[in-house]
Swiss-Prot record:
E.C. code: 7.1.1.-
Subunit structure: NDH-1 is composed of 14 different subunits. Subunits NuoA, H, J, K, L, M, N constitute the membrane sector of the complex.
UniProt GO cellular component terms: NADH dehydrogenase complex; plasma membrane
HAMAP family recorded: NDH1_NuoA (MF_01394)
Classification lineage: Bacteria, Bacillati, Chloroflexota, Chloroflexia, Herpetosiphonales
Entry-linked InterPro entries: NAD(P)H_OxRDtase_bac/plastid (IPR023043), NADH_UbQ/plastoQ_OxRdtase_su3 (IPR000440), NDAH_ubi_oxred_su3_sf (IPR038430)
Family of the protein in this entry: Belongs to the complex I subunit 3 family.
Protein name: NADH-quinone oxidoreductase subunit A
This protein's encoding gene: nuoA
Membrane topology: Multi-pass membrane protein
Keywords: Cell membrane, Membrane, NAD, Quinone, Translocase, Transmembrane, Transmembrane helix, Transport, Ubiquinone
Keyword Methyltransferase included in the entry's annotation: no
Catalysed reactions listed for this entry: a quinone + NADH + 5 H(+)(in) = a quinol + NAD(+) + 4 H(+)(out)
Length: 118
């Protein structure tokens, strides 16, 4: 049993080490010579016109967050629907509770005006 956890620990350590090692090495090995040309904004081969930073409205983020939440809901709902015949009545109750919590959250967001578009 402990050897299974050792394999998971080694895999997790490798998953953290392999991406971070090149980043740390490149920070130490690359030349650091900032010039005004390197710090200038470059857009399609031309100098940027107007303000470089574009501010998005908060509503975009709220819609994106709602989409991610309900997208994850489908990730949980699909395996449940596939294996429903083997899971029984208790799994149905758990999924009803899960969907009720999400529905309450959707109604709350709707009442607060988070889904209103400007």
């Amino acid at each position: 049993m402990l050897t299974n956890y050792a394999f998971i620990g080694i895999f997790a350590l490798a998953a953290i080490t392999f991406p971070l090692l090149p980043l740390v090495l490149s920070a130490f090995l690359r030349p650091n010579r900032p010039t005004p040309v390197k710090l200038s904004t470059y857009e399609c081969g031309l100098e940027a016109i107007g303000d470089i930073w574009v501010q998005f409205k908060v509503q975009y983020y709220l819609y994106a967050l709602a989409f991610v939440i309900f997208d994850i809901e489908t990730v949980f709902l699909y395996p449940w629907a596939v294996a429903y015949g083997q899971l029984g009545l208790f799994a149905l109750f758990e999924m009803v509770v899960f969907l009720a919590i999400l529905t309450i959250g959707l109604v709350y967001a709707w009442k607060k005006g988070a889904l209103e578009w400007i």
